[in-house]
Amino acid sequence: MQRVQPSAARVKSQKKEKAPPDVPDVILDGERKTRYEKGKFLGKGGFAHCYELRNKSTGELFAGKVVPKALLIKQYQRDKMAQEVQIHRNLQHRNVVKLYHFFEDKSNVYITLELCPRRSLMELHKRRKAVTEPEARYFTYQIVEGVLYLHNLKIVHRDLKLGNLFLNDELQVKIGDFGLATTCDNDERKKTLCGTPNYIAPEVLNKIGHSFEVDLWAIGCILYILLFGHPPFESKSLEETYSRIKNNNYVIPTSASAAASQLIRVLLDPVPSRRPNARAVCRDHFFKSGFMPARLPVSCLTMVPHLNDDEYAEENVSPSGTIDQRGPHQAGRSGLSAIPAHLVSRNSERQQTHRMEAYRQPTDCYLSNLLAQVNDLLATPTADIDDAEAALDSYQSPEALPVFWISKWVDYSDKYGIGYQLCDNSVGVLFNDNSRIMLDTAGTQLTYIEKTEKEHYFDMESAIPSGLQKKMTLLKYFRSYMNDHLLQAGQQVTRKVGDDLARLPTLRVWFRTKSAIVLHLSNGTVQINFFNDHIKMVLCPLMQAVTFIDENKRMFTYKFSHLAENGCPEKFLHRIQYAKCMIQRLVEEHTKEETKHNAPAANAVRLPSTSSNVRLESAADIQPAYPSSSRR
């Protein structure tokens, strides 16, 4: 295999890369006599690297922000960090990341923070682009509540953006990173030029003085990104972006509801004094104009939620019902009356159609995108340097970890299909007739997908249609088999509010070779499990990253761009080359099916295996009968 030496520029850039801090495996907070065990790497930004920390006495988990003292040489750097801690340490709000402690040793400064395992809205944006209006209401309302709390304490955040809005396991928004935050009196105006280009307010760029209003401008940008998938003033150059901001040059897509458009316009008003304050935004009609979930399931991080027709329709017309008295951030599906179909205008129907187009995936579920990304990586001259493997830890990208992957599978395709378990313990079956069935972790929500992609949702507490009973029996058999033979016993999971919104990724296509099993999920990820050493490889076209899971369940994630720039070690390179061949095969099969049927072919199929001559029996005689309430 031909290997190419890195260019001088690349070697230079590698040397410039900040080395990770020297962090001991056990960290001592001497003042509190507390010991923390260093866990997995969480990410980096600025001078800091973040690790999961476990209190050795209590077992509690924290996010540990570590800054080497060697990088805090100048007084202004030390002052900036002291101010960040001083502002953040006393904040107590459900929508603000909690800062617990601040301490140091001879080498590093440590800050222990509330752990947010579901990363940030930035990762959600990369996977989903535009989200539904109910989701936008859910996230934006929490952001505004957190900002209202800060403003009541005379704190201006000044760097609100997707990457600083973190998510816990319940997908609650937590405002974090107070590195640019400042305190401000009502009539005071700050002159510092600070912020992030796509979110920065015009008064900051024009240096006329700024205050609390910059946070409301940023919320307008965030709401716009959530709804339409890109920043309102984004361009190919920083100069052009700033020009658009100064001239208030942006366009609201016609798919937006009237309430969303109006809120965006007032938040992005170029005159700061005309923007509403955070309290007024909390009362805005947008949050009452349609369905707002009380809670969102984790599947929303990667899949469009399951919303019924009424909930989509509510986005576009004034609701005939009202938010219940629990407050808009707590209102569930029962909080709004259904809108009669005859009240939805033709224009609303067009808006709904346009918006649904924005959520629709390509028919190949991103296979062609992934193939292009892998081709680009393999076409890049690979750095053949002695320390390429040693340097891997410094450019891991844990923020790009997959949300879902297949943890277990069992092949009964000679008669029925393939059963599998996702990493959240939900269980599914891809039948030989290309239909799919999925049962969530709690065992309460059932999804059935016809080979035509029509979806049906059922509550397990209600009657399942008689036509589905045979497939339900098979699902239970697969689930029982995996529980008895493959899975470790997990804790009992109870049903939660919002579980009915979940749309879990399902297995679309799979095949086996002599070396591996190849699995393609409906959220775009391709997973390859190697038989000889039990390594799993998960490639994600949306995060443009690859994750390796070893036999000890340790996960290592790298962005394709980082592997291209810093060098791809031999142990990864040959697997990625193998993945390219497998993805190429998936793409070719999709193209063949699409041509054959002369229509979008997102149907789930098993490709012929290269390692066996298993006969695939048809299950076409299983034709379920659906109740009239079945939903797409």
Curated annotation (Swiss-Prot):
Gene inactivation effect: Mutants are viable and fertile but about 30-percent of the progeny die at the embryonic stage. Surviving adults are mostly male. Impaired chromosome pairing and synapsis during meiotic prophase. Asymmetric disassembly of the synaptonemal complex fails at the diplotene stage. Partial mis-segregation of chromosomes. Increased germline apoptosis. Simultaneous knockdown of plk-1 and plk-2 causes a loss in pie-1 polarization in the 1-cell embryo, an increased association with the oocyte pronuclei and a decrease in pie-1 degradation in embryonic somatic cells.
Lineage: Eukaryota, Metazoa, Ecdysozoa, Nematoda, Chromadorea
Name of one Pfam family that matches: Pkinase
Cofactor: Mg(2+)
Organism for this UniProt entry: Caenorhabditis elegans
Record's protein name: Serine/threonine-protein kinase plk-2
Function: Serine/threonine-protein kinase which plays a role, during oogenesis, in chromosome pairing and synapsis, by facilitating the recruitment and attachment of meiotic chromosomes to the nuclear envelope during prophase. Promotes the localization of brc-1 to the short arm of homologous chromosomes during meiotic prophase I. Regulates the formation of sun-1 patches along the nuclear envelope. Promotes meiotic nuclei apoptosis in response to chromosomal asynapsis.
Record domain Protein kinase: where: 36-287
Tissues where the protein occurs: Expressed in oocytes.
Enzyme Commission number(s) of this protein: 2.7.11.21
Known catalytic reactions: L-seryl-[protein] + ATP = O-phospho-L-seryl-[protein] + ADP + H(+); L-threonyl-[protein] + ATP = O-phospho-L-threonyl-[protein] + ADP + H(+)
Gene (name only): plk-2
